[in-house]
Amino acid sequence: MTMSNYQRQLFAKHQQLHALLRPFSAPKIRIYPSPEKHYRMRAEFRIWRDDEQLFYAMSRGGALTAQNIVRLHNFPPAYITIDRCMPLLLDALRADPVLHHKLYEVHFLASLRGELLVSLIYHRALTDEWTAAAKALAKRFHILLIGRSRKQKITLERDFILETLNVDGRAFHYHQYEQSFSQPNAYVCQKMLRWACAQAGENAGDLLELYCGNGNFTLPLASHFRRVLATEISKSSITALQENIFLNQTNNIAVARLSAEEFTQAWQKERDFYRLKQAGIELADYQFETVFVDPPRAGIDDNTLFLLQKFPKIIYISCNPHTLAANLQTLTQTHELCAAALFDQFPDTPHIECGVVLRKK
């Protein structure tokens, strides 16, 4: 059997990750593939004008110019509700001067539940006339709609979608906000959640989660621990997390608005934080058996790495295997790698999402 183009890409990613993890005596890497199309739950496009015609546009690389533009009517990598809506929405925008005048970008955000939120971004102020036309458009296409321009945002119904992810037979519900981070590939995200829960096992102790975002991992992992302390610095992410905790009726998660660096200072008693007292959090009450981290592409700072070395078990999700490998230089001084996985969140791109588990030697 010959390999498909997707299988070749995935094999190349596996080889790259294997080479990066080989110095740390990594076990066999489990591979979690993506559907080959209709996997992206969010997509953003420029609007391009050509002879009074409107097109969705992407760049072949670099700045968007007439020489490197890719004109689109639909986008097969996008989730089916986005892909089907794109050409119909474009026709409707073309036909209405109020809606297409100085329209600059269109952003789509979809959920497996079938909800679709569309953001229209303009280089002009939005008027009552625009609002009336936008309401008619939203009703016609059964979508949530937001209009944006400089210092202006008009939300016609709400600025988030409802998502439901299934993990080992249990449904977890999320508010996913426009302009806030959420996992772009819901199919692979569910595989990541199942893997993380399997690695967590059943624990009598507590979980520390750094960089928790909107609670994507927090909620499924909470059922595997006595208590969870989740930290995040973004106020908008914390708002979404608290809503999602309420939505799922989870009662063993405490939330601290701290960066990873600030938590390290608090844990090592280098600094007192009023935010912890305000939330009623006493760090001395926790018995952390596991720490879960999903850091930004830059990886984890040195002080936080030294903090992680104190915990028996580390589950590390990475969107940049190169910074993961750099962080493992420190973490494997005290821990050994006992599990590794590749999650293909981004087919047809060189990006690699991966996870590792480390146990104290």
UniProtKB/Swiss-Prot annotation:
Coiled-coil ranges from the UniProt annotation: none
Residue positions of the active site: C319, E353
Catalytic activity from the UniProt record: uridine(54) in tRNA + S-adenosyl-L-methionine = 5-methyluridine(54) in tRNA + S-adenosyl-L-homocysteine + H(+); uridine(341) in tmRNA + S-adenosyl-L-methionine = 5-methyluridine(341) in tmRNA + S-adenosyl-L-homocysteine + H(+)
InterPro entries xrefs: MeTrfase_TrmA_AS, SAM-dependent_MTases_sf, TrmA_MeTrfase, U5_MeTrfase_fam
Protein family membership: Belongs to the class I-like SAM-binding methyltransferase superfamily. RNA M5U methyltransferase family. TrmA subfamily.
Name assigned to this protein: tRNA/tmRNA (uracil-C(5))-methyltransferase
Keyword Nucleotide-binding: no
Enzyme Commission number(s): 2.1.1.-, 2.1.1.35
Keyword tags: Methyltransferase, S-adenosyl-L-methionine, Transferase, tRNA processing
One biological process term in Gene Ontology: tRNA methylation
Top-rank lineage group of the source organism: Bacteria
UniProt cross-references to NCBIfam families, sorted A to Z: trmA_only
Pfam entry (one): tRNA_U5-meth_tr
PROSITE patterns linked to this entry: SAM_MT_RNA_M5U, TRMA_1
Molecular function (Gene Ontology), one example: rRNA binding
The protein's role, per its UniProt record: Dual-specificity methyltransferase that catalyzes the formation of 5-methyluridine at position 54 (m5U54) in all tRNAs, and that of position 341 (m5U341) in tmRNA (transfer-mRNA).
Top-tier EC class: transferase
